[in-house]
Amino acid sequence: MQVRSAAASDAALLHELAAVTFPLACPPDALPESIQAFIDEHLSEAAFTRYLADPQRELFIAEQDAAPLGYAMLVHAEPTDPDVLAALTSLPSSELSKLYVLPDAHGGGIATSLVERCVSSARARGAASVWLGVNQLNSRANRFYEKSGFERVGIKRFKVGARYEDDFVRARIL
């Protein structure tokens, strides 16, 4: 298994991964049409094309024998959400904005490899911490992030469709 930097030509692949993996991280009672609308707006091929062109973002793809297993996106910019800013104590901080692994690859160390690549990149860019938001009801992800050194430091709002969720803000000091 390898983790590589995503290229501009990976926008369609990243969209395909996101379309499969994002619904798995949503609350069980999230409406399918709200999930799809979020994917269409924030995880489309066009959205990934924009993300890949943004110098403040880095995207990574985990692969095994050239088959994609998951992806991560790191944002090297100060958070604009006041709840996140209030929760963070070590600045500057990069955001682990996206971390998703295909269901068949869960438990194989892929997410850990992606996190460590993101942490290494954030450290190289001078970040004092890495933060993320995770749904409070996503117990699997919360256990993983805790095991990976991300402490719960606050709560922020996350909108899917017309509904707001209260996500945990987690941070890892570098």
Kindly give the residue locations of the regions a language model identified:
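Conserved beta-strand-loop-alpha-helix junction that forms the acyl-donor binding cleft
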Residues: 132-142, 159-165
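Terminal substrate-recognition subdomain of acyl/acetyltransferases
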Residues: 164-174
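Acetyl-CoA-dependent GNAT
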Residues: 5-11, 15-28, 36-108, 112-117, ...
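Conserved active-site tyrosine of GNAT-family acetyltransferases
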Residues: 145, 150
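Extreme N-terminal starter segment of soluble prokaryotic enzymes
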Residues: 1-3
